[in-house]
Amino acid sequence: WRHGDTTSDKRMRARATWFKDSQKLYSNRSDARKVDELFVINTLKDPRPELEVYKYAMPGEVNVPQEVLEIFDVESKSRITVDEDKYVDQTISLHLTKEKSERLYMVRLNRTSDTLDVSYINTSDGSIKFLFEEVNHPYHNWNYRQLAVLNEGKELIYWSEKNGWGQLYLYDGNTGRLKNKITNGGYFVTGRIQDIDTLNRKVYYQAFGRERDVDPYYSMVYSSNFDGSGMRLLTKEKYNHRVNFSESSKYFVDNYSAVDKVPTSVLRDASGNIIMKLED
């Protein structure tokens, strides 16, 4: 039901994603054939209102959409259907490596959203390598949960609330071993990753509630080394910050504002120094 038109009498559109090397592609289809129908009236239909019927799973129902993951090899024209089922009525999110098509990283989340696992798929035979599992009650935070695949899967950066506060962790992408905590040192919440500089082993991210004299709902931007050292505040103005990094990770545009402050846009270097004001 998440992929295209859900009208009951129409075939749903499948989405395909290419690997970076164009050797393979994958499709994660949603099978909603057993899902019950829901009804609405289109009151704007001319000349008279029309009943519309579509597939929609209600909370607690037995039949919900089932995901089907398939991997296609371009050269051999072969297809592998991955046996990715682990949790009943699970949902999955998929993460590509940067250049090669040998692995496809996967996060499987159970229906109650309190248990997930991270693994990777061997795209040649469809086998799955389990890396680690995490349980969080009452549920995992879907908005901030992130997995970044680094250096063709040698390392992973993963967002977790395992200590009660949203933080970033560095994992071995081959074994699932936790290497170290990246963000640490206080009762603050790490938000979304803004950029990753693999060459200098540095991650840029938003965080909330670390600065005592700043509204805890304001997003401030920081950087840390992969080993957890060198945490640095890059946006010192006491406002809410939204940033966009350059491809080189050397610069970023910072747009900051508040309810009583008109937006200001500046260009900064990776250390947070203002190079020039763009808009005020």
Give a label for each model feature.
Residues 1-17, 27-82, 271-280:
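Predominantly five- to eight-bladed beta-propeller fold
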Residues 21-23, 101-102, 153-154, 200-201, ...:
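Short coil/turn segments that connect the beta-strands within blades of beta-propeller domains
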Residues 2-20, 68, 93-96, 143-154:
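Signature of short aromatic-glycine-proline-rich micro-motifs recurring in repeat-based ectodomains
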Residues 73-77, 123-126, 173-176, 225-229, ...:
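Short loop/turn segments that connect beta-strands within beta-propeller blades
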Residues 70-72, 119-121, 169, 222-224, ...:
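Conserved hydrophobic/aromatic positions in well-ordered beta-strands
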Residues 3-5, 78-84, 129-138, 177-183, ...:
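A short beta-strand motif characteristic of beta-propeller blades
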Residues 26-30, 35-38, 62-68, 91-96, ...:
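Non-catalytic accessory segments flanking enzyme active sites
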